[in-house]
Amino acid sequence: MKTKTIFQLVALFAIGATAAPTGCGETRDIQAEAVKPRDVAASQTLHLDARSDIIKGGSSNLERREIWYWCRIGNCNAAFKSLAARCRHEKTAVHIAPESDSDSE
């Protein structure tokens, strides 16, 4: 009976040890998350405790940039606000050239 109890305790310890967090995984410090207002230089960051002050000041204080996606084919200078729009554009007949017609002449 004593052996069975010892075995159960060892098994319980083994299960607990494998289920317990080891700290080896990706850990992120919440305080390291930062928000950059327009007035702050690129090398400076603000911690989350100062974030509430920025939010109270309004979202206009935060720097927001539009992302543009440019056509990657040839000399086309088309710009799009979404990746899906760029992909649709690249698949259009504008960029699907027929086999070179100049070879048949």
Curated annotation (Swiss-Prot):
Highest taxon in the source lineage: Eukaryota
Cysteine disulfide partners in this protein: none
PROSITE patterns per the UniProt record, alphabetical: ZINC_FINGER_C2H2_1
GO cellular component: extracellular region; host cell nucleus
Signal peptide per UniProt: 1-19
Induction: Expressed during multiple stages of host plant infection, including the prepenetration, late biotrophy, transition and necrotrophy.
InterPro entries: Znf_C2H2_type
Keywords: Host nucleus, Metal-binding, Secreted, Signal, Transcription, Transcription regulation, Virulence, Zinc, Zinc-finger
Zn finger (C2H2-type) start-end: 69-95
Localization annotation: Secreted; Host nucleus
MF-aspect GO terms: zinc ion binding
Functional description taken from the UniProt entry: Probable secreted effector that translocates into the nuclei of host cells to reprogram the expression of targeted genes by binding on effector binding elements in rice.
Protein name per the record: Host transcription reprogramming factor 7
